[in-house]
A protein has these predicted regions:
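ABC ATP-binding cassette signature C-motif
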Residues: 1, 75-277
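Coupling and communication elements adjacent to P-loop NTPase active sites across diverse families
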Residues: 1-96, 108
Length: 277
């Protein structure tokens, strides 16, 4: 007796087997597809791991930007009066109103002071007036870092040309080395200053302060455009500086770690708010 009694039974069985084969084929394809997906996921995971490792290493490379402010000649004797500044009335730059009265500020030796106060109270206006007096003095070497960097930066020059005051190749090489330590690329060193970010401009001015060997620094929001990774380095540099610092800041860490005295700007003048021991 034949295995299959009729053609219809044979067709039905063949159809079932064909469906089973197609199902197995589809499962095999899906399995290969899943393996490919898993492989892609694992590859992506490894790539993210490598990126994470690189990111965790960033603070170490950022810490390496350290360089000193001033030199052995920047130290100011403890008893030397850096400034004894008096002003009856502080006017707005346009002369339309009085911001404060009876201002008095005395700084001696290596004192580092910070002026705080509300926006519009006249802090920057006062600091500019103080800088005008100190920058003219011959018995000290003062440098000023304004809140608006463009007041000092020559925007069409490259960072190297702006910082180069001698034209000697040796000095230009040193400037490039310092800029490299501040994470400037060779290309960025040749860009006009106007194309730089706020943080890059701040680094140029910080390097200018260092190269100048000044012993009095006048700083308006000195930590404002530096990254959180650079902040501790900048604060340490200013803390170790052997000269005097007159500054404005809203940065609590800077005030606590760097400044010896904190003055509040009021309509009645400068009020000593606290002395850090």
């Amino acid at each position: 007796m034949p295995l299959y009694s009729d053609a219809r039974s044979l067709q039905r069985i063949c159809g079932q087997r064909l469906k089973g084969f197609e199902k197995q084929k589809k499962e095999a394809i899906n399995e290969r597809s899943e393996k490919k997906k898993m492989h892609a996921v694992k590859s992506m995971e490894k790539r993210f791991q490598r990126e994470d490792e690189n990111m965790t290493e960033m603070p170490e490379t950022e810490d390496a930007i350290y360089f000193k402010l001033g030199d052995e000649n920047s130290e100011i004797p403890a008893g030397k009066t850096v400034i004894e500044y008096s002003l009856d009335k502080l006017w707005t730059p346009d002369g339309s109103r009085i911001l404060a009265q009876n201002i008095f500020l005395r700084i001696r030796g290596e004192e580092k002071i910070c002026i705080i106060g509300s926006n519009g109270s006249g802090k920057t206006t006062l600091l500019k007036k103080i800088s005008e007096e100190l920058l003219q003095r011959k018995d000290i070497h003062a440098e000023y870092m304004p809140q608006n960097y463009e007041e000092i930066l020559e925007l069409e020059k490259t960072p190297v040309d702006f910082l180069d005051t001698t034209g000697y190749q040796e000095d230009r090489t040193k400037i490039r080395t310092y800029l490299g330590s501040l994470k400037y690329t060779a290309s960025e060193m040749e860009h006009p200053v106007r194309e730089l970010s706020g943080g890059q401009k701040a680094k140029v001015l910080l390097l200018k302060l260092s190269l100048s060997k000044a012993n009095v620094l006048i700083l308006d929001e000195p930590t404002r455009n530096f990254s959180p990774l650079s902040g501790p380095v900048i604060r340490q540099m200013l803390k170790e500086f052997r000269g005097a610092v007159i500054s404005i800041s809203h940065d609590r860490k800077y005030i606590d770690e760097v400044c010896d005295k904190v003055y509040r700007m009021t309509e009645a003048g400068l009020i000593l708010e606290r002395e850090n021991s």
